[in-house]
Amino acid sequence: MPITLDPEKLAIVMKHKFQYKICRECGARNPPDAEKCRRCRSRNLRPKKFKKK
C-alpha cells in the first residue's frame, strides 16, 4: 500500500525523514531543537532541505 494515500502515515514519514538539523561542518544529523552539533559541538546548524514535488 502506497504511503501517499494515507495522510497520517505520510505525516509520520515526513516528520522522521525531514525534521532534523544538519551540521554544516561535519554533516552529522541532529535533533530539530538542537543548538549545538552532537559530534563536533559546532553551532553552525541548518534545517534539513526539503523540496516538495
Swiss-Prot record:
Per the UniProt record, the source organism is Pyrobaculum islandicum (strain DSM 4184 / JCM 9189 / GEO3)
Q: How is this protein named in the record? A: Large ribosomal subunit protein eL40
Keyword tags: Ribonucleoprotein, Ribosomal protein
User: Where exactly are the transmembrane stretches of this chain?
Assistant: none
Key word ATP-binding present in the record? no
NCBIfam families from the UniProt entry = PRK04136.1
Record-level GO BP terms = translation
What is any one of the record's Gene Ontology cellular component terms? ribonucleoprotein complex
Q: Which domain of life is it from?
A: Archaea
By sequence similarity, the record places it as follows: Belongs to the eukaryotic ribosomal protein eL40 family.
| Gene that this polypeptide is encoded by | rpl40e
The question of whether Ribonucleoprotein is a record keyword is answered with yes
Q: Which Pfam families match?
A: Ribosomal_L40e (PF01020)
Please give one Gene Ontology molecular function term for this protein: structural constituent of ribosome
